[in-house]
Amino acid sequence: MNPFQQNESKETLFSPVSTEETPPRLSSPAKKTPPKICGSNYPLSIAFIVVNEFCERFSYYGMKAVLTLYFLYFLHWNEDTSTSVYHAFSSLCYFTPILGAAIADSWLGKFKTIIYLSLVNVLGHVIKSLSAFPILGGKVVHTVLSLVGLCLIALGTGGIKPCVAAFGGDQFEEKHAEERTRYFSGFYLAINAGSLISTFITPMLRGDVQCFGEDCYALAFGVPGLLMVIALVVFAMGSKMYKKPPPEGNIVAQVVKCIWFAISNRFKNRSEDIPKRQHWLDWAAEKYPKQLIMDVKTLTRVLFLYIPLPMFWALLDQQGSRWTLQATKMNGNLGFFVLQPDQMQVLNPLLVLIFIPLFDLVIYRLISKCGINFTSLRKMAVGMVLACLAFAAAATVEIKINEMAPPQPGSQEILLQVLNLADDEVKLTVLGNNNNSLLADSIKSFQKTPHYSKIHLNTKSQDFYFHLKYHNLSIYTEHSVEERNWYSLIIREDGKSISSIMVKDMENETTYGMTAIRFINTLQENVNISLGTDISLNVGENYGVSAYRTVQRGEYPAVHCKTEDKDFSLNLGLLDFGASYLFVITNSTKQGLQAWKMEDIPANKVSIAWQLPQYALVTAGEVMFSVTGLEFSYSQAPSSMKSVLQAAWLLTVAIGNIIVLVVAQFSGLVQWAEFVLFSCLLLVVCLIFSIMGYYYIPIKSEDIQGPEDKQIPHMQGNMINLETKKTKL
């Protein structure tokens, strides 16, 4: 810093003195002063911009919070497909900002770009909400509408991403740089507030509200769409107050053209007779100005450090996909509150708001007092290590979940349980195949085997013969089964004898946190069971078996049941996370129906609170990596290259999501092993980044100031030339 300069927020401390007379200037008409907020230096127009950003971020993060479970529950995609499409959408949201910036800088300007692409965003939310209406066609229609809606949302939300914050900065005069800095802090707060509130509310709209007999995804997508409409209306209301700078040209395009020309010109002049140049970018000197070439040289040094960064984002962005899927296999009952699986994502914005001041005001200062030179690159490397530890913690939790989960049938295997609905005990033997020892004990009346038994098959499908011994009777029955399935053999009275029914249970896949229930009706009349306004089950007479239905976790003390001439209520009790229940309707009295409740698959046992350490670690890593990375990048590049750096930073996020997409589709690993893989990959990348950072020589701020950053007034007489800096955000 110049010794005469004490405050960088001021343009200059001394005015140049000239001995020559200055000719009088013609008076120009005074510019109309824009309205301020409560007499401050803040333009009133920024209030509309901040509210717009809050609503837009609410719509984006709210929709995204329930997106993975929408793929699972509504479209019935598997985990890998759901993860891949989720990250493909996220990646597209970070590619489209380059398009939005190009449109704003080269054609429409920021204001019109925000308006037009917000309309595209609104249309995308409307289509996305329509894709969640079961009455609108079948699965193909829902899938097409969903993908079209997501593409429009990605174009809209990504396209305005580089425009809104910068447009707010345009509203300030240069002399109000301090207020502009505080505006950006408020803008960032609006982003996190929108994310925090939406990731808490939209899962409640999904799970606590029922429509069309299931979770109300139409409402969970519709409310964010409504917030996007509000965002557009609020932004348009401030139109007359805004400063609307005209398009200034796309610096990103200029940089790309400069690099391309330098490379092509170098290859055209490969002859040994042509003198070599000091730097490969110097081959652009025939077409581009020297200052631009110097700025691009400085830029490429920073972009080289960006090469390892996508791997960090590959881990960070799995909070909404793989970690949400993990939460569906855990128990969300915290005692004082029941947390939905997709609500765990609220921890990230909440912890960001806590960790940023904690790190800035406490941790970094303590490290500095210990005499440790904790540079920006070191902070970023530590952030990577914390993300590695977060995924190691996630792998540990996943292993514990697998230990508590019921066994899965493999190739040429089935899992079998036996339910005895007869009035006395039954001895059952599986004939042949050395399976007769699996069911050695007698099964008492209205009891079941304590767990599923694994039965081995000779082929993929097979007929099994069972010997049932009841009183003095011996009954032989035959049933067909197929590999990799769960079965219940139901023994029932048949006059003075018994018979059996083989029923396929829930398939060998998780219910993703939902509760699965079904009914067996032993009465001689049909029973209709209503589980909600739109959920109804018809159970046939004489040991009819209903289909499975999935419902939200909760207490069901009075489920409405109806026979041909009577109405009853049935107490199902607590239906817990991830469990599968069988209710056997055994009797009908004046007081109501009586049912035997049996838990086929136990509820999730691992508490969702065990995800807290991994969220805390990855969020701490995000604060150290993301915030510090942007700060470092901006300090190492000329002001003319800030927008290029922003585009490159967003590209690293997009590439990180593509990495997750590829791994999810082609790794073929079990989930805990995939978490370990990501952790190890980032650790290797962290080592590479640390080596790159070790040899990186930071550039001093005065070495990268362009002409627009300097004021060197011409002085006459014995006055001293003073160099003055402008504050850059």
Curated annotation (Swiss-Prot):
Residues 79-87, 135-139, 205-217, 317-343, 402-611, 665-674 are extracellular. InterPro entries: Alpha/beta_knot_MTases, MFS_trans_sf, Oligopep_transport, POT_fam, PTR2_symporter_CS. It comes from the Eukaryota. GO terms for molecular function: dipeptide transmembrane transporter activity; peptide:proton symporter activity; tripeptide transmembrane transporter activity. The chain crosses the membrane at residues 58-78, 88-108, 114-134, 140-160, 184-204, 218-238, 296-316, 344-364, 381-401, 612-632, 644-664, 675-695. PROSITE patterns: PTR2_1, PTR2_2. Strongly expressed in kidney. Also detected in brain, lung, liver and heart. The extracellular domain (ECD) region specifically binds trypsin. Belongs to the major facilitator superfamily. Proton-dependent oligopeptide transporter (POT/PTR) (TC 2.A.17) family. Proton-coupled amino-acid transporter that transports oligopeptides of 2 to 4 amino acids with a preference for dipeptides. Transports neutral and anionic dipeptides with a proton to peptide stoichiometry of 2:1 or 3:1. In kidney, involved in the absorption of circulating di- and tripeptides from the glomerular filtrate. Can also transport beta-lactam antibiotics, such as the aminocephalosporin cefadroxil, and other antiviral and anticancer drugs. Transports the dipeptide-like aminopeptidase inhibitor bestatin. Also able to transport carnosine. This is Solute carrier family 15 member 2.
